């Protein structure tokens, strides 16, 4: 994507824009890493110490209205709701960030790619000034998450969609196999700081989960030595998702309810005990997740795609992507935002239903009603009462977004069809791909539109569903792209017959 001329210009820009602080950061990157990269980090003067960047909790309603009410909370406070019961949002001092121009930020973020200097080797913490600027490097709990590849879906785009510029952001290529790592590194790092400042304020961290959040929470808490508790809906997550928190030492509670029931319970528990809430109702996680949007811009050499399609369940991630793109636009790193698509499973589609009733996003809030989610292969988005509904609606309105749905057969067929072109998709990515197929069929998305599908988890976490599909063992589903194994005898003739049949030899 990047030409030699562009690379030369970028290199020149880095040299021209280098300040004493950025040059010191670059010098660290050029040195050999010490045995203890945390100790090495302590020897540096962090960028945020040289500047006056800060962040705090404010009511999300202030962000919606564009008017600051004056209500705010320190990120060191254990607080999840505003005084009126609404959600909170992490608000950055944009004026302070804007004092350093877009060339400065682009050069700084680009310079941190590929380093092992703590903590900037992480795709999240390479944007630390835009995430948690006041956090000490020594408090950070990171597994060098992020920096996931942007897969050019050349063959799938051409053959299935007639598209020339289709990409898949592989957020599932991460430590625990899902995008949830991006948010959990931020939340657990802040908890690590709070526990040091106020030793008895937090005894454990808990979450309700459809599988991926619990895996990320348990892994990051284990790395930090912090106890974790996960509430899982019984028999509604994959075996791979279940075993992850068990292996990482979490207290795993398998509860006879759905995700929404687990969510109600964890909110009650965290309200009455010193257990910290890790669900996306806590906006700290969204600060990490927004960095995937910034990564996409970096990977396109700071060019903005036309469309970004995101699977939606609890709906925090679409707001996180919106926030990342919005910050880049407001600070001048790019001059526009992509249009956003929220893709929901038909069996858990309250936002899609509201979008259809409202005939668009303008009056979508008035049309919204929670639903009772039905079973879906896309189990991580099997949510009927999403916590971040207001966040998602704001994102869709501001980004001229749309909402699409996918049936069980559509999502499984889309995932399997794309798998045949070199991918290995989770069912949630199948939802997004199925939505894209529909939008192309209606010509909402053009053949030459640069489009990014966000893949939220690794397909290996959902191997059971793939086995069922390719075995044609899914009731009431034709499984048209199934590729079942062929059983043959230990005989050359039988083997040759199978090969000839397959390849018409």
Set out the residue ranges of the language-model regions.
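N-terminal chloroplast transit peptides
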Residues: 1-21
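N-terminal mitochondrial targeting presequences
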Residues: 1-4, 23-44
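Intrinsically disordered, low-complexity, compositionally biased regions/tails
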Residues: 6, 14-16, 31, 105, ...
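Serine/proline-rich low-complexity intrinsically disordered segments, especially terminal tails, linkers
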Residues: 9, 13, 24-26, 67-68, ...
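Small side chains
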Residues: 12, 30-33, 206, 401
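Residue-level marker of intrinsically disordered, low-complexity segments enriched
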Residues: 15, 23-26, 35, 88, ...
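PLP-dependent amino-acid enzyme catalytic core
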Residues: 37-505
């Amino acid at each position: 994507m990047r030409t030699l001329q562009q690379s030369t210009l970028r290199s020149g820009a880095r040299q021209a824009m280098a300040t004493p602080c950025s040059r010191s950061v670059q010098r660290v990157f050029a040195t050999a890493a010490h045995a203890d990269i945390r100790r090495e980090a302590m020897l540096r003067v962090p960028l945020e110490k040289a500047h006056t960047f800060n962040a705090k909790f404010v009511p999300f309603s202030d962000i919606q209205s564009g008017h600051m009410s004056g209500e705010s909370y320190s990120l060191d406070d254990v607080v999840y709701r505003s005084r009126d019961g609404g959600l909170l949002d992490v608000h950055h001092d944009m004026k302070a960030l804007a004092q350093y121009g877009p060339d400065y930020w682009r050069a700084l973020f680009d310079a941190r790619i590929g380093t092992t200097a703590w903590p900037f080797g992480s795709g999240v913490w390479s944007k630390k000034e835009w995430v948690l600027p006041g956090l000490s490097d020594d408090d950070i709990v990171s597994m060098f998450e992020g920096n996931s590849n942007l897969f050019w879906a050349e063959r799938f785009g051409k053959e299935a969609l007639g598209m020339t510029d289709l990409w898949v952001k592989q957020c599932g290529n991460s430590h625990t196999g899902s995008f949830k790592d991006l948010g959990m590194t931020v939340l657990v790092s802040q908890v690590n700081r709070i526990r040091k400042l106020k030793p008895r304020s937090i005894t454990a961290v808990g979450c309700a989960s459809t599988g991926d959040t619990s895996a990320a929470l348990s892994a990051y808490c284990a790395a930090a030595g912090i106890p974790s508790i996960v509430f899982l809906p019984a028999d509604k997550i994959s075996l791979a998702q279940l075993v992850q928190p068990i292996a990482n030492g979490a207290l795993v509670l398998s509860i006879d309810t759905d995700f929404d029931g687990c969510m109600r319970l964890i909110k009650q528990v965290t309200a009455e005990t010193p257990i910290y809430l890790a669900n996306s109702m806590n906006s700290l996680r969204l600060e990490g997740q927004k960095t995937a949007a910034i990564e996409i811009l970096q990977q396109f050499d700071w060019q903005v795609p036309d469309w970004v399609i995101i699977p939606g369940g609890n709906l925090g991630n679409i707001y996180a992507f919106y926030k990342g793109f919005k910050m880049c636009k407001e600070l001048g790193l790019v001059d526009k935002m992509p249009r956003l698509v929220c893709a929901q499973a038909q069996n858990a589609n309250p936002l899609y239903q509201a979008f259809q009733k409202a005939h668009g996003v303008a009056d979508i809030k008035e049309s919204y009603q929670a639903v009772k989610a039905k079973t879906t292969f896309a189990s991580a988005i099997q949510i009927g009462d999403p916590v971040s509904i207001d966040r998602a609606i704001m994102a869709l309105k501001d980004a001229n977004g749309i909402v699409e749905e996918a049936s069980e057969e559509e999502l499984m067929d889309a995932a399997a069809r794309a798998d045949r072109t070199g991918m290995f998709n989770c069912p949630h990515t199948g939802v997004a791909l199925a939505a894209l197929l529909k939008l192309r069929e209606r010509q909402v998305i053009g053949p030459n539109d640069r489009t990014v599908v966000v893949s939220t988890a690794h397909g290996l976490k959902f191997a059971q569903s793939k086995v069922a599909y390719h075995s044609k063992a899914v009731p009431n589903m034709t499984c048209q792209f199934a590729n079942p194994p062929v059983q043959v005898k230990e005989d050359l003739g039988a083997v040759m017959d199978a090969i000839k049949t397959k390849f018409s030899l």
